[in-house]
Amino acid sequence: MKKERTESLVAQALKNIGNDRYMLDNLVFARVKQLNAGAKTLVNMDPKRHKLVDIAIREIAEGKIDIDRIDERN
């Protein structure tokens, strides 16, 4: 996996959800709750080595999680 700066991942995540920072915050929070409850990651990142927030942001940046998919998983 290519190492990317957090700023570029957040920028891509924002772009994927229409540049709505409030929505990004809520989406990251909801996904972190899922990951903390045992949900499998959708990206190749080990939750024991990476922060759950970083994993959630990468999933959103890569388009693997969006508001519709987060609702389905809750």
UniProtKB/Swiss-Prot annotation:
Pfam families: RNA_pol_Rpb6
EC number: 2.7.7.6
Gene3D superfamilies, per database record: 3.90.940.10
Keyword Nucleotidyltransferase among UniProt keywords: yes
One GO CC term, this protein: DNA-directed RNA polymerase complex
InterPro entries: DNA-dir_RNA_pol_omega (IPR003716), Pol_omega/Rpo6/RPB6 (IPR006110), RPB6/omega-like_sf (IPR036161)
A single GO BP: DNA-templated transcription
Catalytic activity: RNA(n) + a ribonucleoside 5'-triphosphate = RNA(n+1) + diphosphate
GO MF term (any one): DNA-directed RNA polymerase activity
Keywords annotated in UniProt: DNA-directed RNA polymerase, Nucleotidyltransferase, Transcription, Transferase
Family: Belongs to the RNA polymerase subunit omega family.
HAMAP family documented for this protein: RNApol_bact_RpoZ
NCBIfam families in the cross-refs: PRK00392.6-2, rpoZ
Quaternary structure note: The RNAP catalytic core consists of 2 alpha, 1 beta/beta' and 1 omega subunit. When a sigma factor is associated with the core the holoenzyme is formed, which can initiate transcription.
Function in brief: Promotes RNA polymerase assembly. Latches the N- and C-terminal regions of the beta' subunit thereby facilitating its interaction with the beta and alpha subunits.
Protein name per the record: DNA-directed RNA polymerase subunit omega
Organism: Helicobacter pylori (strain ATCC 700392 / 26695)
Name of the gene this protein is made from: rpoZ
